[in-house]
């Protein structure tokens, strides 16, 4: 079955093709479809539904959409749903002029903002742990993925999953050629590697997106 992916990100297409090998995963770009919906949601799930519904209205076919991002405990969950637009401490939700920031620069700014928060001495590790934060120390961070498989405007299966880790202390320590986004600075203590250093199979097994996709598969196994 042909399933449209509401993204032109080639890395996401590869991941979804590996998780749904029995289906043909097609992006808007593959078929020359202009697709750039405005993501106005305040949650990952809201944004994934915005994208899925927008592409379904164009194609009339099943659509997979996800919205993902990284949240840093010590920064109150920043950048969260604005991860792709994050532009430093002054522009958590993106620059007012809409200018895109290179990923390497975003990585450096996020590490810098966290380092400044830690250096300020205002963070309370014990209190944070009581709130379920800092499971991996003051540098704790997690990825979230909200994924939907939409077959009608109001007919969809949804799953939300996370992957926990820490941020590296210096952008110069960023490493790994796999993955994308903040993966080169997202360290996984249990693996001793960044998310970008994992093989595709390793990442799909533990990542927020891989876990969400498998939940979707289980929900709609008969599709």
Protein language model features and the residues they cover:
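Anionic-ligand binding patches
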Residues: 2-4, 11-223
């Amino acid at each position: 079955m042909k399933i449209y992916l509401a993204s032109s990100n080639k890395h996401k297409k590869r991941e979804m093709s590996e998780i749904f090998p029995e289906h043909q995963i097609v992006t808007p770009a593959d078929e020359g479809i202009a697709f750039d919906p405005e993501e106005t949601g305040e949650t990952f799930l809201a944004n994934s539904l915005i994208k899925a519904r927008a592409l379904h209205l164009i194609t009339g076919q099943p659509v997979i959409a996800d919205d993902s991002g990284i949240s840093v405990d010590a920064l109150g969950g920043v950048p969260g749903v604005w991860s792709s637009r994050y532009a430093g401490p002054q522009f958590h939700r993106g620059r007012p002029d809409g200018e895109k920031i290179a990923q390497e620069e975003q990585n450096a700014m996020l590490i810098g903002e966290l380092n400044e928060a830690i250096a300020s001495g205002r963070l309370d590790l014990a209190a944070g742990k009581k709130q379920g934060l800092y499971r991996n120390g003051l540098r704790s961070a997690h990825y979230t993925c909200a994924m939907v498989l939409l077959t009608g405007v109001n007919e969809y299966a949804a799953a939300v999953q996370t992957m926990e880790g820490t941020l590296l202390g210096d952008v110069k320590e960023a490493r790994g050629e796999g993955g994308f986004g903040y993966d080169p600075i997202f360290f996984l203590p249990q693996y001793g590697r960044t998310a970008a250093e994992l093989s595709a199979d390793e990442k799909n097994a533990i990542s927020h997106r891989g876990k969400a996709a498998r939940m979707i598969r289980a929900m709609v196994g008969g599709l």
